[in-house]
């Protein structure tokens, strides 16, 4: 079915007439999106990536999380309107706005409030799945990053940019990885393999950051892209938010975000300790994710400038080096 045909069917489910216009929009890494104009209303049509090698149910995961947010009265995310599981299309509320250019303390407080809001009534979310790549032990966090490091070593020197990436991986990233892995593996087995109690987990948008926020005309923020959302270790959620390569937070705003969010969760002392241990690990993981640009693109992936992605990987590696320097051996 074409996007227009799917849209017509989904609009009929919510009692709307056929669309006047279905306009493709710049998409994300794992989906395609269209603006749908219907009379005086606008909607968002979203197509979710799926393949035999990556069969994650992105539509189901996002839909369940958006329904949960609506059930607790949150209006910070788009309303889910209609879906077609057979074609992996969904019709969502269209949020008009642009990614925020300037960030201030009020934006940090807004994001912290959104995280608090979704975690205030966990009983409503007991049936939600875990996030994609959820990790509930130190060992699981380590193994997830190890898998990405191993994959990076498949990159070949097929161009000048690829050669620079290979050199960076060999001379910087692998040395950093080996040092950090040695530190973590020096922990007692019981500490590395201890499973985080369900009561200490959090609900997370997963890909949470200002790169997935839209500033509306009144200055307020709303958030999009919940296709990996679910239960997670709050340490991972907080680290990812402050270290998104697209929008790395300056130190003062990152500190404010942690100040406002750490008390939201049970056992903040243990959370502080996990943050200190896992922050450089996830900065290394983000460097690996940036370097995915050096692999052949998946069908939905936009082409990322290789020099930009290598620069971002270098930034993440530098941040990891700084974090490791803060922590005594």
Regions picked out by a protein language model, each given a short descriptive name:
Residues 2-18, 123-206, 271, 328:
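An alpha-helical support segment within catalytic cores of ATP-dependent transferases
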Residues 9, 64-71, 93, 117, ...:
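Residue-level signal for well-ordered alpha-helical scaffold segments within enzymatic catalytic domains
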Residues 23-26, 30-157:
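ATP-binding pocket architecture of kinase catalytic cores
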Residues 23-40, 44-45, 184-237:
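Active-site acidic catalytic loop and adjacent metal/ATP-binding pocket
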Residues 97, 221, 229-231, 244-247:
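Activation segment
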Residues 164, 288-329:
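ATP/Mg2+ or Mg2+-diphosphate-binding catalytic cores
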Residues 182-189, 220, 255-274:
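Short amphipathic alpha-helical segments and their helix-coil junctions
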Residues 234-268, 280-300:
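Active-site activation/catalytic loop segments of kinase-like enzymes and analogous catalytic loops
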């Amino acid at each position: 079915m074409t996007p227009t045909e799917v849209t017509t069917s989904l609009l009929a489910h919510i009692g709307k007439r056929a669309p006047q216009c279905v306009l493709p929009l710049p998409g994300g890494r794992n989906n395609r999106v269209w603006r749908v104009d219907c009379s005086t209303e606008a909607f968002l049509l979203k197509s979710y990536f799926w393949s035999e090698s990556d069969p994650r149910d992105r539509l189901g995961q996002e839909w369940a999380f958006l329904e949960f947010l609506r059930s607790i009265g949150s209006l910070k995310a788009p309303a889910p309107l209609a879906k077609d599981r057979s074609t992996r299309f969904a019709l969502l509320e269209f949020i008009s706005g642009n990614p925020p250019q300037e960030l201030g303390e009020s934006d940090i407080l807004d994001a912290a409030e959104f995280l608090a809001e979704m975690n205030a009534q966990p009983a409503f979310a007991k049936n939600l799945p875990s996030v994609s790549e959820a990790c509930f032990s130190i060992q699981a966090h380590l193994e997830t990053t190890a898998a990405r490091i191993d994959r990076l070593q498949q990159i070949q020197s097929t161009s000048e940019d690829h050669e620079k990436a290979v050199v960076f991986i060999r001379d910087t990233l692998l040395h950093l990885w080996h040092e950090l892995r040695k530190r973590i593996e020096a922990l007692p087995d019981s500490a590395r393999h201890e499973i985080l109690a369900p009561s200490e987990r959090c609900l997370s948008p997963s890909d949470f950051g200002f790169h997935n926020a839209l500033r509306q005309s009144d200055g307020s923020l709303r958030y999009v892209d919940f296709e990996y959302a679910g239960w997670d270790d709050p340490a991972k959620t907080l680290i990812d938010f402050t270290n998104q390569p697209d929008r790395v937070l300056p130190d003062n705003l990152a500190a404010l975000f942690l100040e406002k969010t750490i008390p939201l969760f049970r056992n903040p002392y243990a959370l502080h300790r996990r943050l200190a241990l896992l922050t450089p690990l996830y900065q290394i993981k983000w460097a690996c994710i940036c370097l995915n640009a050096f692999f052949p693109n998946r069908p939905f992936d936009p082409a990322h400038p290789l020099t930009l992605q290598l620069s971002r990987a270098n930034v993440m590696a530098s941040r990891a080096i700084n974090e490791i320097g803060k922590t005594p051996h």
